[in-house]
Amino acid sequence: MKLGRAALGLLLLAPSVVQAVEPISLGLALAGVLTGYIYPRLYCLFAECCGQKRSLSREALQKDLDNKLFGQHLAKKIILNAVFGFINNPKPKKPLTLSLHGWTGTGKNFVSKIIAENIYEGGLNSDYVHLFVATLHFPHASNITLYKDQLQLWIRGNVSACARSIFIFDEMDKMHAGLIDAIKPFLDYYDLVDGVSYQKAIFIFLSNAGAERITDVALDFWRSGKQREDIKLKDIEHALSVSVFNNKNSGFWHSSLIDRNLIDYFVPFLPLEYKHLKMCIRVEMQSRGYETNEDIVSRVAEEMTFFPKEERVFSDKGCKTVFTKLDYYYDD
């Protein structure tokens, strides 16, 4: 970049030199400068380029989390600080690795979407954001060796093209044990792996594994008359990581990623209560352009099922199905 600027300056500020240069040579020199310096910048004005989005705004990320994610004070704080700190670190020692755990409908996928949108204009549709779904991309246990090779090649190729690549692994609880260990070299504290640096990449894992342990903690607080906001990360994180590591039905079962402490944060997503469902419904109404109708909000929330059976504290599907239930009341 600096070399291109210097070359352009010499050509513009030294007419005596320019006159002595053959027209063809001068044209080639100018073309080289324009192609190598100016063209990429013009191109990135009209198409997505790696790392071309404006600097990550802490305020914008916090606003998205506050307005779109409900009942998850732990996840909000961890995600905000971890992502903002990582993106603004010019020389991270390793990739950022986040493992999001909780029941369905609590916001795990939504958070990965928010992260992607705050880093790339295209969000989940960006060429630099890659989503893997265990049951879709890695369905057969007999093909684990093949999947490992393919996964390594895919990650290596995409990080080579864009150091700030984001990789999202959904349904980790359904992934075949041992498969995810194939990416261990990319998550470790290496400057280079076969000539490629992975230190600016982001890896996000989504899983239902450990949800029972998270629920136990939340229920204990509720039964003790404590506010869920009083739950601290230290109350859950260690027990969560141990639970996931020892869960034979989890893709992290005895994984070297956990054993070698390569997961930066185990992020617990608490089960949602009745009041949180109503928040989800209101936001969905607003996104569809409807005025908030509290009667409909209450009716939709009351149609959901809750657990434990006797106390009916937490929604068993979170906010996942409130959107389709809302369709019933706005059948155009």
UniProtKB/Swiss-Prot annotation:
Region of interest called Interaction with SNAPIN, as start-end residue ranges on this chain: 91-251
Any one GO BP annotation for this protein: chaperone cofactor-dependent protein refolding
GO CC aspect terms: cytoplasmic vesicle membrane; cytoskeleton; endoplasmic reticulum lumen; endoplasmic reticulum membrane; growth cone; nuclear envelope; nuclear membrane; secretory granule
Membrane topology field: Peripheral membrane protein
InterPro entries, per the entry: ClpA/B, P-loop_NTPase, TOR1A_C, Torsin, Torsin_1/2
Any Pfam family: TOR1A_C
Signal peptide from the UniProt entry: 1-20
Region span, Interaction with KLC1: 251-332
Listed EC numbers: 3.6.4.-
Primary residence: endoplasmic reticulum
Enzymatic class: hydrolase
Modification comment: N-glycosylated.
Protein location: Endoplasmic reticulum lumen; Nucleus membrane; Cell projection, Growth cone; Cytoplasmic vesicle membrane
PANTHER family according to UniProt: TORSIN, TORSIN-1A
Family: Belongs to the ClpA/ClpB family. Torsin subfamily.
Assembly mode: Homohexamer. Interacts with TOR1B; the interaction may be specific of neural tissues. Interacts (ATP-bound) with TOR1AIP1 and TOR1AIP2; the interactions induce ATPase activity. Interacts with KLHL14; preferentially when ATP-free. Interacts with KLC1 (via TPR repeats); the interaction associates TOR1A with the kinesin oligomeric complex. Interacts with COPS4; the interaction associates TOR1A with the CSN complex. Interacts with SNAPIN; the interaction is direct and associates SNAPIN with the CSN complex. Interacts with STON2.
UniProt function note: Protein with chaperone functions important for the control of protein folding, processing, stability and localization as well as for the reduction of misfolded protein aggregates. Involved in the regulation of synaptic vesicle recycling, controls STON2 protein stability in collaboration with the COP9 signalosome complex (CSN). In the nucleus, may link the cytoskeleton with the nuclear envelope, this mechanism seems to be crucial for the control of nuclear polarity, cell movement and, specifically in neurons, nuclear envelope integrity.
Protein name (record): Torsin-1A
Organism: Macaca fascicularis (Crab-eating macaque)
Lineage start: Eukaryota, Metazoa, Chordata, Craniata, Vertebrata
